[in-house]
């Protein structure tokens, strides 16, 4: 057994336990800052170990490490590190200044990494629950906020239902395939001389339902707006990133691997989910006046675009999805850095109208937000354009012309509410200026703005890494 396959996960878990003990024994009343810095350091160290980790399958065929797993782990670690950085500046204002907060982010990211390396239905579920349980607590971490408690409870109840659907679907697949290993399931389906049993198809549908819930894709999106609005904003930024990357890692690996031989049966379902997510996300965001709710509906639409690559069912489509998720990370983290900076007299303001005149009172922050909004709309030459271009090309090459057409229409509709935010910032009468923001938020917003604007310079290496990751799914 090659234990080095899981060395990044082992190190991250040990770091999490060490930081937890450090926080308990610290004599400071609130060792939040030191624990946050240690958590970011643990993410960086784990990232280096992920890059250096070898390929292989180990631990009795329940854990796999390949180019795809490494790609998704790096995305998840980046999402966790950026969420921790976003928390540092405003932890006291958001009432989350307790050392357990970064530790929970760390263990949630650990679960996301386990999901990316899952090669067995059991590790799939364990990784999913490790990630989800930490997020349930994080959503309700601001105990004095009524909306935070409501968000945590709502996400817990609906998330438990989704986990039950996933577990029931997994049990059906295990019952019909006779094994929990992905390779064994794939062999059972590929060597079957009869039609695919209806019970097995029900199992696939239930698993698909559980995973699309984690993606906030239609029709399992109902929790997203309320939870995004009620949770602490840095938690919302995290939820919009790492957990979705992990769910996509599971979805792509399971659908391309063990269920690849029954692709015609599930592709039509995924295509419908993608269409509905794009249209609903774009249309429902138009009347929103709260920017966190708008970002929630926007994320529903973005997951629809990312699912287009899976609908294609090709390595080109998977590559498009991975590049899209990379660009989504940059845009999402940057936009939430601006949203966290929206404070007046120490109080959080999340109304779109509160951005009025930001171009006059804080032109740097307004310019960064404009970059992220135009990128989410898919305007060239920003990062979001290249992500959409790749998934659209993959859909067209797979002859999914209707899906591609709906994607274009949804992008045009979505452009309206993104441009509306830019209009409010630069052309409306100025509101009272926002509070001075900490250096960490300026660092993240500027860094993400530069990365989003100059993504073309790294498109080649990112696309090559995504291509290698996609090819690993079809070996």
UniProtKB/Swiss-Prot annotation:
PANTHER family: NADH DEHYDROGENASE. It is a multi-pass membrane protein. GO terms for molecular function: NADH dehydrogenase (ubiquinone) activity; NADH:ubiquinone reductase (non-electrogenic) activity; quinone binding. Its EC number is 7.1.1.-. InterPro entries: NADH-Q_OxRdtase_suN/2, ND/Mrp_TM. NDH-1 is composed of 14 different subunits. Subunits NuoA, H, J, K, L, M, N constitute the membrane sector of the complex. It is found in: Cell inner membrane. Pfam families: Proton_antipo_M. One of its GO terms (cellular component) is plasma membrane. It is an enzyme of class 7 (translocase). The keyword Nucleotide-binding does not apply. Its main location: membrane. The keyword Cell membrane applies. Keywords: Cell inner membrane, Cell membrane, Membrane, NAD, Quinone, Translocase, Transmembrane, Transmembrane helix, Transport, Ubiquinone. Belongs to the complex I subunit 2 family. It catalyses: a quinone + NADH + 5 H(+)(in) = a quinol + NAD(+) + 4 H(+)(out). The chain crosses the membrane at residues 5-25, 32-52, 71-91, 99-119, 121-141, 155-175, 193-213, 232-252, 266-286, 294-314, 322-342, 366-386, 389-409, 439-459. NDH-1 shuttles electrons from NADH, via FMN and iron-sulfur (Fe-S) centers, to quinones in the respiratory chain. The immediate electron acceptor for the enzyme in this species is believed to be ubiquinone. Couples the redox reaction to proton translocation (for every two electrons transferred, four hydrogen ions are translocated across the cytoplasmic membrane), and thus conserves the redox energy in a proton gradient. GO terms for biological process: ATP synthesis coupled electron transport. This is NADH-quinone oxidoreductase subunit N.
